[in-house]
């Protein structure tokens, strides 16, 4: 899709209007609390019997979560790297074994993005991480673990499954600059449209909301 065609499909994302709505959402929330902001999308034109499900990891321009929920599952070679870079990690050897099952389950529950060093399969199966709705990154030779960690902060999962009628993704939180939230929305919607078989023709409605507020219609 050309850049012009993409811009035409997302013309409803006028910056002035959307940033104004974001500001109103933020003002309606308790300033002492940080609340997640997400986009909800109603879809049309899909046949659940024929169309393929969509599961994508989207990397947005700005951090989407207020708290670090990224963890390195570290082998011996990467423990020192994590310590030097002040990255949260758990050593594989320290949480392996039947007697550490509760610790492993707690780590899995508390974190969203997992950086998996070689040997991670001693404690976690990839399919179980995915089944829990988490986002894994298997560290390859040459990967910069700091860069991967920063990417994790900006990543969110997009799923279009089951009846294909609705999907959603996180775009930020009420502690962020409204302009940054807007940029995350714009990039996220651009990626979503690129994954849809008929582009913006598959969009039925687009809304923005916080964890606590009713949705506000954008499209």
Curated annotation (Swiss-Prot):
GO molecular function annotations of the record: RNA binding; structural constituent of ribosome
One CC-aspect GO term: cytoplasm
Keywords attached to this entry: Cytoplasm, Ribonucleoprotein, Ribosomal protein
Entry-linked InterPro entries: Ribosomal_uL1, Ribosomal_uL1-like, Ribosomal_uL1/biogenesis, Ribosomal_uL1_3-a/b-sand
Coiled-coil annotated residue ranges, if any: none
Subcellular location: Cytoplasm
BP term (GO), one: translation
Cysteine pairs bridged by disulfides in the record: none
Pfam families the record matches: Ribosomal_L1 (PF00687)
Family (UniProt): Belongs to the universal ribosomal protein uL1 family.
Protein's name according to its UniProt entry: Large ribosomal subunit protein uL1
Taxonomic source organism: Encephalitozoon cuniculi (strain GB-M1) (Microsporidian parasite)
Species classification: Eukaryota, Fungi, Fungi incertae sedis, Microsporidia, Unikaryonidae
Gene encoding the protein: RPL1
């Amino acid at each position: 899709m050309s850049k012009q065609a993409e811009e035409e499909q997302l013309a409803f994302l006028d910056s002035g209007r959307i940033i104004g709505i974001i500001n109103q959402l933020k003002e309606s929330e308790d300033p002492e609390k940080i609340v997640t902001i997400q986009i909800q999308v109603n879809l049309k034109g899909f046949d659940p019997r024929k169309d393929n499900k969509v599961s994508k990891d989207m990397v947005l321009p700005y951090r989407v979560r207020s708290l670090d929920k990224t963890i390195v599952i570290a082998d011996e070679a990467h423990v020192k790297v994590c310590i030097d870079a002040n990255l949260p990690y758990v050593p594989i050897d320290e949480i392996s074994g039947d007697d550490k099952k509760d610790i492993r389950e707690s780590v899995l529950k508390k974190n969203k993005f997992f950086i998996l060093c070689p040997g991670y399969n001693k404690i976690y199966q990839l399919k179980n991480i995915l089944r829990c709705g988490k986002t894994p990154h298997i560290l390859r030779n040459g990967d910069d673990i700091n860069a991967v960690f920063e990417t994790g902060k900006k990543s969110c999962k997009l799923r279009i499954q089951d009846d294909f009628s609705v999907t959603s993704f996180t775009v930020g939180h009420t502690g962020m600059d409204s302009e940054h939230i807007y940029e995350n929305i714009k990039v996220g919607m651009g990626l979503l449209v690129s994954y849809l078989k008929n582009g913006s023709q598959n969009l039925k409605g687009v809304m923005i909301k916080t964890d606590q507020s009713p949705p506000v219609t954008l499209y």
